[in-house]
């Protein structure tokens, strides 16, 4: 039995966020989501920026529980569902806010979009020769499945249980990482490592330690992105990573691949972002293109 297909614009309301303009924007400073904060299936809320919003813009640019937040550019279609992680959040112009009608289950629409994006099914709605975008009108033309509402709800609820389990595990991982950071600070910053009482400290380090430049103990290379025509989602070639867009909590996520490459990083390499947010770190799980 085949499901009915409808255009996204027929079953949702969508809009872009606010343009960042320091000279024209008025109101009070409030946090907002930018493209970099939206990952595949989750939000990176560690480096939120703020801009001015007027009180009457809360409805226009505000987001609420169940809104689907979709990237307009960068990696068009990358999306996550908002669940009031932070109150009174707004969005910047690089993002679409999609709010479903009552005839659709927001979880089903989200998981459909997540799958379509991962499979490259959204590329037909992109515009641009080198830098890809998915403007509002194209977004509204995206054809999505529309099974009976009860079926949507069952699918959405079933898949959501896995996401909830993942989220709980990630919270536990974060607590463990915070504990590891505290231990690192205690040992290597405060120098309160086991046996420190009997260790002589010279110039801020134990007497037997040495200070080295990074390039004396590691190979440091700068990435060089291949042309976008070589990118794919079909796992052809090697995973390709550019900036923090594919960063995970600790390890990079292999979403985009490239059949052409000049610079590569081997497994267990440390990636250091050189563009905003500068200094973000991640680790490679395997050989990748950078």
Model-assigned labels for residue ranges:
Residues 1-19, 141-225, 246:
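Non-catalytic DNA-recognition/assembly elements of restriction-modification systems
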Residues 1-2, 89-96, 127-156, 287-290:
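A short glycine-rich beta-alpha junction/loop motif
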Residues 6-24, 36-68, 85, 199, ...:
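Sequence-specific dsDNA recognition surfaces
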Residues 76-83, 279-284:
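Short, Lys/Arg- and Gly-enriched loop/turn segments at beta-strand edges
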Residues 85, 99-105, 285-289:
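Ligand-binding loop in jelly-roll beta-barrel domains
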Residues 107-138:
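Short, positively charged
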């Amino acid at each position: 039995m085949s499901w009915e297909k409808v255009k996204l614009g027929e079953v949702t309301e969508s809009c872009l966020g606010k343009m960042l303009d320091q000279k024209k924007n008025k109101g009070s400073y409030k946090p907002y989501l930018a493209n970099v904060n939206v990952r595949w299936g989750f939000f990176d809320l560690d480096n939120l920026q703020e801009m001015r919003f007027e009180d009457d813009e809360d409805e226009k640019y505000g987001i609420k529980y169940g809104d689907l937040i979709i990237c307009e550019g960068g990696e068009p279609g990358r999306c996550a569902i908002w669940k009031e992680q932070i109150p009174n959040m707004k969005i910047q112009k690089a993002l679409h806010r999609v709010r479903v009608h009552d005839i659709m289950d927001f979880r089903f629409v989200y998981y459909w979009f997540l799958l379509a994006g991962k499979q490259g099914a959204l590329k037909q709605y992109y515009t641009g020769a080198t830098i890809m975008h998915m403007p509002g009108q194209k977004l509204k033309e995206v054809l999505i499945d529309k099974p009976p509402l009860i079926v949507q709800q069952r699918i959405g609820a079933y898949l959501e249980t896995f996401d909830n389990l993942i989220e709980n595990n990630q919270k536990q991982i974060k607590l463990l990482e915070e504990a590891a950071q505290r231990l690192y600070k205690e040992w290597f910053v405060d120098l309160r490592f086991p046996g420190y009482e009997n260790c002589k400290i010279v110039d801020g380090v134990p007497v037997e330690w040495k200070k080295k430049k990074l390039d004396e103990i590691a190979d440091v290379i700068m990435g060089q992105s291949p042309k976008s025509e070589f990118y794919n989602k079909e796992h052809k070639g090697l995973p390709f990573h550019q900036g923090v867009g594919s960063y995970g909590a600790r390890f990079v996520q292999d979403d985009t691949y490239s059949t052409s490459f000049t610079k590569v990083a081997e497994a267990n390499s440390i990636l250091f972002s050189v563009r905003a947010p500068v200094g973000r770190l991640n680790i490679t799980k395997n050989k990748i293109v950078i």
